[in-house]
From Swiss-Prot:
Function per UniProt: The glycine cleavage system catalyzes the degradation of glycine.
Top-level class of the enzyme under EC nomenclature: transferase
Reaction it catalyzes: N(6)-[(R)-S(8)-aminomethyldihydrolipoyl]-L-lysyl-[protein] + (6S)-5,6,7,8-tetrahydrofolate = N(6)-[(R)-dihydrolipoyl]-L-lysyl-[protein] + (6R)-5,10-methylene-5,6,7,8-tetrahydrofolate + NH4(+)
Keyword Nucleotidyltransferase: no
One GO-annotated biological process of the protein: glycine decarboxylation via glycine cleavage system
Subunit comment: The glycine cleavage system is composed of four proteins: P, T, L and H.
GO cellular component labels: glycine cleavage complex
The enzyme's E.C. designation: 2.1.2.10
GO terms assigned for molecular function: aminomethyltransferase activity; transaminase activity
Upper classification of the organism: Archaea, Methanobacteriati, Methanobacteriota, Thermococci, Thermococcales
SUPFAM superfamilies named in the record: Aminomethyltransferase beta-barrel domain, Folate-binding domain
InterPro entries for the chain: GCS_T (IPR006223), GCS_T_bac (IPR022903), GCST_C (IPR013977), GCV_T_N (IPR006222), GcvT/YgfZ/DmdA (IPR028896), GcvT/YgfZ_C (IPR029043), TrmE/GcvT_dom1 (IPR027266)
Name of the protein in question: Probable aminomethyltransferase
Assigned keywords, A-Z: Aminotransferase, Transferase
Length: 398
């Protein structure tokens, strides 16, 4: 049976399409993908992303454990702030892209992908048990996914909405900075973060879930529902729209963000014999802190010496067509890779995508062809984002 988020009943009543995604029944759209997408680019939208995973690490050894099991340096940010970091396997391949918040008092909250949290929880539990064969750890690992409702408010008007709701200016916060806030007596974690390319914030509310796998923890999500409805109520004057996963995907792709399960994963069994994707191949080296030891480091150092072989690259179509995952990519008549993500940009009305190709073609300005249902259509590799960053996105000129 598919998993359900806290507010599934609300979405079932209001969404036009609900579909299973990563094992969860989720709203895909309420009005239309294009309308919700443009609302976020031009005003503000709110997403229920409670399907995202949360894992809590507690204890004096929590930091040391996470420093070894993730790639970035999570010791630097003060409480309450987050660090974008990767979890790798021993071969250096990406198990997931995560955000780890330093919650203070030796507690760290990891935000991970919907289709990866169970795997990660099992992985961390296994590593803890393995290490404890040699030395005792002061560490507890707790799965919190079903206990936390998570909403993402995104768009140029998100700043105004945060001021109205919480009395804070998110532009005075750095990216991934968090703080505790209250709304009508309901306490929650707020972070300046998002997955759309736009300014925005995300809130985390601990609440009962009527669909919790543990029957004893089931109940009405009164706090989460109240916050969700207050966001929609206060956002009306800014043109807010509830947005589904359809718009979330087109928005992240326009911004050039990778999606775990498509662009990054441990096993990617495509017809071009792509097995696994590493941070170096996915242009994610910025999330690696080389001055420490971590799982997968040796494999990455060897890959640096040997060469990447293949790499992710962004592209836009030069002919009218829409690229999709799995479509073959050619250059000079040679098969060079496959599309990992593709869509029609609602903002630009052109086909855009990400492909995993031979390393020598993974640079801007290379003419390629995408095989779309037996016809090769012209495209060109580009540097993301796909939109004009002076007009749209986090760094737009107001």
């Amino acid at each position: 049976m598919a998993k359900r988020v806290h507010l599934f009943d609300w979405h079932k009543e209001h969404a036009k399409k609900i579909e299973e995604f990563a094992g969860w029944e989720m709203p895909i759209w309420y009005s239309s993908i294009k309308e919700e997408h443009l609302a976020v680019r031009n005003a503000v939208g709110v997403f229920d992303v409670s399907h995202m995973g949360e894992i809590l690490f507690k204890g004096k050894d929590a930091l040391k454990f996470l420093q070894y099991t993730t790639t970035n340096d999570i010791s630097k940010p003060p409480a309450i702030s987050g660090t974008y970091t990767l979890v790798l396997n021993e071969r250096g391949a990406i198990k997931d892209e995560t955000l780890v918040f330093n919650m203070g008092n030796n507690e760290y909250l990891m935000i991970c992908d919907a289709d990866a949290f169970e795997k990660l929880y099992a992985w961390f539990t296994y590593l803890k048990k393995t290490i404890e064969q040699f030395t005792k750890l002061d560490l507890e690992i707790e799965l919190k996914t079903y206990d936390i409702a998570m909403f993402a408010v995104q768009g140029p008007k998100a700043r105004d909405l945060a001021m109205d709701l919480f009395g804070i200016d998110i532009n005075e916060m750095w990216w991934f900075q968090g703080r505790w806030v209250e709304l009508d007596g309901i306490k929650m974690l707020l972070s300046r973060s998002g997955y759309t390319g736009e300014n925005g914030f995300e809130v985390y509310i601990e609440d009962l879930n009527p669909y919790h796998p543990d029957e004893e923890k089931r109940g009405k999500p009164e706090k989460a529902l109240h916050v969700w409805e207050r966001i929609l109520e206060e956002g009306q004057k800014y043109g807010i729209k509830p947005a589904g996963l359809g718009a979330r995907d087109t928005l992240r792709l326009e911004a050039g963000y990778t999606l775990y399960g498509n662009d990054t994963k441990e096993l990617q069994l495509l017809s071009t014999d792509i097995d696994e994707v590493t941070p170096l191949q996915a242009n994610l080296e910025f999330a690696i802190y080389w001055d420490k030891d971590f799982i997968g480091k040796d494999a990455l150092l060897k890959q640096k010496e040997k060469g990447l072989g293949r790499k992710l690259v962004h592209f836009k179509m030069l002919e009218k067509s829409v690229p999709r995952e799995g479509y073959k990519v050619y250059a000079n008549g040679e098969l060079i890779g496959e599309v990992t993500s593709g869509t029609l940009s609602p903002l630009l009305n052109i086909g855009i995508g990400i492909a995993f190709v031979k390393e020598e073609y993974a640079k801007p300005g290379v003419e390629i062809e995408i095989d779309i249902r037996g016809t090769r259509k012209k495209a060109i590799t580009v540097t993301p984002p796909f939109y004009d960053p002076k007009k749209y996105g986090l760094f737009r000129e107001e």
